[in-house]
Amino acid sequence: MPISNSSGSSTKSITRAGSELDRADSITSPRFVGRRQSLIEDARKEREAAAAAESSEASEQIVFDEEDGKALLNLFFTLRSSKIPALSRALKVFETFEAKIHHLETRTRRKPKDSLEDLEYFVRCEVHLADVSTLISSIRRIAEDVRTTKEVKFHWFPKKISELDSCHHLVTKFDPDLDQDHPGFTDPVYRQRRRMIGEIAFRYKHGEPIPRVEYTEEEIGTWREVYSTLRDLYTTHACSEHLEAFRLLERHCGYSPNSIPQLEDVSHFLKERTGFQLRPVAGLLSARDFLASLAFRVFQCTQYIRHASSPMHSPEPDCVHELLGHVPMLADRTFAQFSQNIGLASLGASEEDIEKLSTLYWFTVEFGLCKQGDGVKAYGAGLLSSYGELVHSLSDEPERREFDPEAAAAEPYQDQNYQSVYFVSESFTDAKEKLRVYAAGINRPFSVRFDPYTYSIEVLDNPLKIRGGLESVKDELKVLTDALNVLA
């Protein structure tokens, strides 16, 4: 539902922001939107391609895979629990046709018929190609809701942090060598500089120190203009978590108008604060690869800077956007966990869910607002790295709605101008809990768990693995219980 804009200090901030809109238009470059525009577009294209492939398969009515004259069949059917001999009769059918059963599982149907508890069976088996239709007909005589399906195949995802070396699929839409609308397209010196800095990311491997970049005077001048302009605005528009982290970054990581911080130094700072670390990237990653990195508490970060002719906006991610917008927020523990949870939810997800998660990321991590005190503040990196959009977001112009993951994931996003709709979170803790509920509804036959000791992903697809995870939780609870006893 819409958020009221009439609270005390919020009104002051909004009035101030409204009076600054004209100034914003006068000092900003043409309205390029920062960071995740292509994250959603890329996810959408992948989903449409997958849907087209599924449609093609459906039109051919392929319900099994064929290999060496054998059919690999995935078969679902339902047996009434009151029919005790039913299962033995069903298994007899598979035996008669010399079917080799690879997998058999049961589950209670969600909608039992006639008030009786039904059991649904899933059988993956191998049978002679010529016997498929006869086997299915035989099962239909003793079972209900008989159907076949293609095997559900889930996308590969990294299980170890070192496997992020394979997650480097770039989206080239905003490459200055290819995009004629890019501010650097007609500048051969800038394009050559971009290629040189991009090579650092292409060559980088996990575990290596991030190479340092010696920035030019022109690049530092661009940084200085953005840094000084935004820093003054943060005091009235940025959330308290961003302000606190920004002060620490100035104290410990060389944040200042006169120098561009090095990723290696910033990465060490983040790792000590929240366990997040940076990894150099040459441009916009595909949605799936970018989100997978977050699952390991790794943020893929660019080292190049926007073109000097467009200091206040960039059509793509750059170090201004990353260092001023994302890094301070990743220094907050609750927000860092929220970001990682989006990444964990993406692992093995369908193309449709990747698109929804990308859109959810857009309206939170990139363009999110939150309640603080009697007002509303910005926490999204797309806002905190863009003077014009930061002013716009807290003015009277846009609509503000209460954060709801389902609604945010389905909201059309604006990529040609400032957003017309922003979502406002009660708190990062509240947003994290809402995301947890949303992620639980994503259709995967497994859950995942991040192991912070080995920086790996554990796939929870059987009771033994879940029991092992619970043992770890029990150990941690014992430590906390003992601590309470000491204080009692």
Curated annotation (Swiss-Prot):
EC number(s) recorded for this UniProt protein: 1.14.16.2
Keywords: Catecholamine biosynthesis, Cell projection, Cytoplasm, Iron, Metal-binding, Monooxygenase, Neurotransmitter biosynthesis, Oxidoreductase, Phosphoprotein
Lineage of the species this protein comes from: Eukaryota, Metazoa, Chordata, Craniata, Vertebrata
Positions where Phosphoserine occurs in the chain: 38
Record field: compositional bias (Low complexity): 1-13
Molecular functions (GO terms): iron ion binding; tyrosine 3-monooxygenase activity
The keyword Oxidoreductase appears for this protein: yes
Means of activity regulation: Phosphorylation leads to an increase in the catalytic activity.
Source species: Anguilla anguilla (European freshwater eel)
Function: Plays an important role in the physiology of adrenergic neurons.
Identification of the protein by name: Tyrosine 3-monooxygenase
Gene: th
